[in-house]
Amino acid sequence: GVGIGMVAQGFPWQKGDNVVLPADEHWNNTFPWLALREKGVDVRLVEPDSDERVTPESIARYVDKRTKIVACAAVRFNTGFRADLQKIGEIAHAHNALFLVDAIQCAGAIPMHVEKLGIDIMAAAAFKWLLGLPGSGFLYINEQARQIISPILPGMFAAENDFRELRYLDDARKYEPGTFAYPLFHAWRAGLDLLQEIGIDTIHTRFLTHT
């Protein structure tokens, strides 16, 4: 939620711009966008079909030249529906929009190749399949998106060590809001080491044998 909120508030919106996302997404991928209505942003909610699916075709009907971001969950929290990320990303990019993915329900369980899938921004908490603890998580943001989205809470690790001028680092660290929760990340490292030892592809294959 924090990562998505930073993106939503850091984008240079103009009145009349729009963001497209499926209706009834998790609150962490809904509230940050709904808050943009106060800035005159058109928040377009795509209704799921009768089978609770949100297809690329249904999303495409809401995307136009004023769409700046298309956001969706890789796997919906309330139904388990798995989105066709590659096709949705293609739709977003065809309209020069950024593609953001909420990956909390799949990161660590499903291979997520961001470049292959056309994902510009991806965020997830660590406490599900990533074997972390509540309060830890990640925000992936590619170079193109970094040129557009401004930091909203620059912390001590976001810029060069200068007391008189703010010179952001040229990678995703410029979005770091403050001091790390070191105990959480030390614990998370152990979980990530275990995931790497087993392999995400192995985990995914195992899941498919039970679903």
What residues fall within each predicted segment?
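Pyridoxal 5′-phosphate
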Residues: G1-T211
